[in-house]
Amino acid sequence: MKTKVGFNRLDRKSSHRKALLRNMVISLFRHEKITSTKAKLSEVKRFAEKLITRAKVDSVHNRREVSKFIHDKYILNKLFTRISPIFKERKGGYTRVIKLGQRYGDAAEMAILELVDKTLEEKQ
């Protein structure tokens, strides 16, 4: 019997894990780059890719579905008006994980998660 198959639970209860992932996704869309442990970023990447794919088609339904996960109206608007148009022709792979090595204190594997295309400031 297989157990714990499907996703990384990050050693947290479900409500804490959801809040952590939501806050990290919002930070990614706000700053376009975040630094954390590799395990956290690989989970954040899953959610960010799904949200960007959903935001590529700007409809009322898609805005409501994305707003279930992103509660910040500024970030929601930024996702639909500034981030998703950059990725219109791209089929997937909107983010990249760059490994940084181990953290000094506890030897945790650190990484950077960033949006693939050039930053939004350079595009405008």
UniProtKB/Swiss-Prot annotation:
Part of the 50S ribosomal subunit. Contacts protein L32. This is Large ribosomal subunit protein bL17. One of its GO terms (molecular function) is structural constituent of ribosome. Belongs to the bacterial ribosomal protein bL17 family. InterPro entries: Ribosomal_bL17, Ribosomal_bL17_sf. It comes from Borrelia turicatae (strain 91E135). Keywords: Ribonucleoprotein, Ribosomal protein. One of its GO terms (biological process) is translation. It comes from the Bacteria. Gene3D superfamilies: Ribosomal protein L17 (3.90.1030.10). GO terms for cellular component: cytosolic large ribosomal subunit. Pfam families: Ribosomal_L17. SUPFAM superfamilies: Prokaryotic ribosomal protein L17 (SSF64263).
